[in-house]
Amino acid sequence: MTTRKPEELEGVTLLGNQGTNYLFDYAPQVLETFPNKHTNRDYFVKFNCPEFTSLCPQTGQPDFATVYISYIPNEIMVESKSLKLYLFSFRNHGDFHEDCMNIIMNDLIELMDPRYIEVWGKFTPRGGISIDPYTNYGKPGTKYEEMASYRMMNHDMYPETIDNR
């Protein structure tokens, strides 16, 4: 039994759709939302996306990452299948790691207007170097703006070792 009213699910068209169209080029328009039924409290929603792929803008070589997206929702939330398809749309998108993470965060801010959001990409090494861009945002003029500043200063306090990648 669902606690969602049909009108709350009107914008959710991809979930349960067997004819899913996988887009291979950057496509923010696939993102869908649904209402947050718990706006009276703060809570984190975290997505772990271990199969993110994009292309190096210079060489066209594939880059692979696990992307972590954590956010405190405001009025609306991102639907997970649409997020999966959106992230998949980076498959043929050529951009640097840092750009991809900021694009994802900017698109999700525009889509949801969250109280707080952070996006962290842990890319596999290429040329012997791994790059782990982290970006975050707190709604200006709120406690979440302070939270973003604090988390930025303290986000990665543990040096990388072979067993925590």
From Swiss-Prot:
Its main location: cytoplasm. The active site is at 56 (thioimide intermediate), 63 (proton donor). It catalyses: 7-aminomethyl-7-carbaguanine + 2 NADP(+) = 7-cyano-7-deazaguanine + 2 NADPH + 3 H(+). GO terms for cellular component: cytoplasm. Pfam families: QueF (PF14489). GO terms for molecular function: preQ1 synthase activity. One of its GO terms (biological process) is queuosine biosynthetic process. InterPro entries: GTP-CH-I_C/QueF, NADPH_dep_7-cyano-7-deazaG_red, QueF, QueF_type1. Catalyzes the NADPH-dependent reduction of 7-cyano-7-deazaguanine (preQ0) to 7-aminomethyl-7-deazaguanine (preQ1). Belongs to the GTP cyclohydrolase I family. QueF type 1 subfamily. This is NADPH-dependent 7-cyano-7-deazaguanine reductase. It comes from Bacillus pumilus (strain SAFR-032).
